[in-house]
Amino acid sequence: MTRLLARLGPDPLREDADPNRAWANLQATPGALGAALLDQAVIAGIGNVFRAEALFACGLHPGRPAASLTRAEFDRLWATVGEIMGRAVDDGRIVSIDPPAGRSRTEIPEDEARYVYKQACCRRCGAPVASWSLGGRTAYACPVDQPAASG
């Protein structure tokens, strides 16, 4: 078990996680940021919904080269992933949108709970959400809020 865990990257939900190790892992990863985030040896615990919504929140395109991330962009991404994942643990489901006044995240219908993941249109700006295969999974991005030339 210890050897298996040693192959995992830092887990954003763990207080003892080393973000510097995650940063180094991303900088050493060839290929797209969106694919790198699904690689559990780079950062542990990120699945497709977390990838889509965290990249959206940070305005980062999934196809951007992982090694092109600046340290400031990485720091924001690390914090955002930890926040979204932590809320999901607390709520028992993934809700990335801010609930309307007077409603809790848990009251938001499942099909309205995310900005771009499995959405036809971006829930922030209304642009059609692009989707394509990346890292063996479907990637989602808003062409307005996550332009391909974002890095």
Annotated model-derived regions:
Residues M1-A57, P65:
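Phosphate/anion-contacting hairpin/loop surfaces
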Residues M1-A6, D16, F74, P143-G151:
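Acidic, proline/glycine-enriched N-terminal capping motif
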Residues G31, R64, D90-I94:
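Intrinsically disordered or highly flexible coil/loop and linker segments, enriched in small
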Residues V49, H61, T138:
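Gly/Ser/Thr-rich beta-alpha loop segments that engage phosphate groups in nucleotides
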Residues G59-S68, F74:
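RNA substrate-recognition surfaces in RNA-acting enzymes
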Residues E73-D90:
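Basic, amphipathic alpha-helical segments enriched in Lys/Arg and hydrophobic/aromatic residues
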Residues V89-G151:
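C-terminal accessory segment of soluble enzyme catalytic cores
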